[in-house]
Amino acid sequence: MDPHDDHPDAILRLPDPGATDALARRLAPALRAGDTILLEGEIGAGKTHFARALIRARLAALGLDEDVPSPTFTIVQTYEAGEAEIWHADLYRLSGPEEIWELGLEDAFRTAICLVEWPDRLGSLRPSDALTLRFAAEQDDSRRLGLHASGPRAQALLRDLLAGAGA
């Protein structure tokens, strides 16, 4: 559990899936190898939707139209996306850091753009410089998104993202 859950750096309201897609499209071009986005929230909160929208946006910018499946059963999906490979990991079914180490995710944190669902499973492997997006479903089907940046690169991404969101 992220110690900043109760005190995010910023909170956004995403009224519908289109707003989630738009946010993902804004963030996608800013990401580079070594960037990590940690996606938190309950099942159905919007983590996978956001990750898939971001990956699609990154691939579309390269003229690619690939299927972007959920990594729920494969645990990790990778995509060649120009200058940086993208790793989309869903750690829900893993029990802890030792299984994550076997996947090679620790190395990917340095060499790829990493989108990680259920980052609480990372334990001590959690990157110190990461942008955390905490999704929460609201009663009206909108999403409340808490954002927290830990580290200088994540802080720069958050500033740019909020500037583009008009926050």
Where do the protein language model's features map onto the residues?
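Post-Walker A helix-loop "phosphate-sensing" segment adjacent to the P-loop in P-loop NTPases
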Residues: R56-D67
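Hydrophobic anchor at the beta1->P-loop junction of P-loop NTPases
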Residues: I37-L39
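Conserved nucleotide-sensing/catalytic segment adjacent to the nucleotide-binding pocket
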Residues: D67-E117
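P-loop (Walker A) phosphate-binding loop of NTP-binding proteins
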Residues: E42
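N-terminal pre-Walker A segment at the start of P-loop NTPase domains
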Residues: D2-A24
